[in-house]
Amino acid sequence: MHLRLISWLFIILNFMEYIGSQNASRGRRQRRMHPNVSQGCQGGCATCSDYNGCLSCKPRLFFALERIGMKQIGVCLSSCPSGYYGTRYPDINKCTKCKADCDTCFNKNFCTKCKSGFYLHLGKCLDNCPEGLEANNHTMECVSIVHCEVSEWNPWSPCTKKGKTCGFKRGTETRVREIIQHPSAKGNLCPPTNETRKCTVQRKKCQKGERGKKGRERKRKKPNKGESKEAIPDSKSLESSKEIPEQRENKQQQKKRKVQDKQKSVSVSTVH
C-alpha cells in the first residue's frame, strides 16, 4: 500500500516537472519573438508572467500591450511608440492608442501628425481645411492664405530713346519694384512690377558717339550754301512744267491779242 502511494507521488512529481519545463520553453520562444518583453521580470518589468509578459512596470516606465499573432503581451517602455500617447496614473503609467485618423498624438484630444489624406488643424485631423485657410500638401496642415507683397517703386530711369539720352525730343522712362512675398495657392496674385511712360528728352548736345541715327542723316542731307538756290527750283517753274501744251498755246495767243490791242489803241490816239 505504501509502495503504491510512493509510486503515484513520484509519477505526479515527474508530470509537474514536465509541465513546468514546457511552459518555460514556451516563454523563452515568446521572448525570442518579441525582444521588448522583459525576461524573467528583468529590465523594466516589476511583475510578470511567462505567458503574458509584463504585468506591471518599474517607476517612470510606460506599460503597453503589443500584439504578437493572435495574442497580446505586456511590455515596459521608456516612451510610448508612434500612434500611442502616455498617461501617468498613481499606480501605473499607461500607453493608449491615438484616434484612427491620427498618426501621432499628445493626448486623446490633441493630434500632432495626421495619417495620409487628412490635414492637421488645432490638434484635429480634417478632410478639408476650414474657410479662410488652405491645405499645405507638404506639411499636411491647414495654414493661413498668403497674399503677394511688393516693395515701393524705385525712382524713374533717365528719359531715353533707342538707348540714347540725347538727339531726340521724345522718349520713354521706366521704374520697377520687387516682390517681397510670393502668394500661396489661394492668395492674391502679384501686381505688375514695372511701368513705362512717355517723357521729354533733355535738350543737350550729344557727345561724340551719342548722336542718334536721325541726327546723322540730317547732317548728311543738309545742302551747301552755294548750291542751295540752283538746286531748288522756284514755284513758277514748277507750275509751268505741270501745264498741258494746249494751255501754253492759249496763254501765248492771249498775250499776242493784248499786244495787238495796245498797238491799235496807240494808232487811234495818233490819228486824233
From Swiss-Prot:
Q: Glycans attached where?
A: 36
Complex and partners: Interacts with the extracellular domain of FZD8 and LRP6. It however does not form a ternary complex with FZD8 and LRP6. Interacts with WNT1. Binds heparin. Interacts with LGR4, LGR5 and LGR6.
According to its UniProt record, which protein family does this protein belong to?
Belongs to the R-spondin family.
Compartments, as annotated in UniProt: Secreted
**Entry's PANTHER family?**
NEUROHYPOPHYSIAL HORMONES, N-TERMINAL DOMAIN CONTAINING PROTEIN, R-SPONDIN-3
**Ranges: FU repeats:** 35-86, 92-135
Compositional bias ranges of the Basic and acidic residues kind = 224-252
Which segments cross the bilayer? none
Cleavable signal peptide: 1-21
Q: Among the record's GO biological process terms, what is one? A: positive regulation of Wnt signaling pathway, planar cell polarity pathway
Q: What is this protein called?
A: R-spondin-3
